[in-house]
Amino acid sequence: SGTGVDNVLTVTLAGVFPGADSLNTALTLSGLTLTPPLTVNYLVAAGGGGGGGQVGGGGGAGGLRTSYGSITGGGGGSETQLTLVAGTNYALTVGGGGAAGVVGPSATSGTVGTNSVFSTITSSGGGYGGSLPSPTAGAGGSGGGGGATTNVNGPGGAAVTSPVIQGKSGGNGFYSWAGGGGGGATTAGANGVTGAIGGIGGSGLSVNILNSGNATTSSVGEISGSDVYYAGGGGGCGSNTSAASGGIGGAGNGGYTSGGP
């Protein structure tokens, strides 16, 4: 979306999407009188991972890649703008979020988010949150938070680094029934801690490729003041009476129970 300013067209691929991917969507540039090349800024955010089901870790944020501003997801430098040609179709894939894990005797971890693609730019889906009985979290654009058991601190998932870093790792679960927070675009998820307190999710990245008014209209990102944040990590589950918060950038909060599983 957006308009050309000084021969720069801004394209945003992020927001709230259905669970199923939007595949084979075409971006067509036509009816334009241009002097090649047309350079575009972009923000591509993948689907976030699903949180773990039973004393689970938070889902990791989907990977975030952008050419706008000074940094991209994971703290790397902003990426190179793309060059597009009028009259050419460019395929888009909008990745869906991963499913949350199942609670109960047959508890499961969440599932990974799916990738988002714009032209040659691919952002990796977020890692899943760990859960009883397998508390290890999954890797992704940002890693999922580790789950918890009575004997094991479930390790958080790693953030992918290839082809570029896109987010941060998930926090570790704590054996006293506290899941780790999912990683966000700028900070890692927090570890679960004693007292059965789940870890908070990692923070997303402020990218004002759209101003706050346009982002609100388009239902993308999370607004804070005049800034728009993307790709926060989910909060981890605890066994106390307060839910761990998700990181700024549209993430969900962790759940809680009144005691251990």
Annotate each predicted stretch with a short phrase.
Residues 7-9, 25, 30-32:
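The right-handed parallel beta-helix/beta-solenoid scaffold, focusing on the short coil/turn
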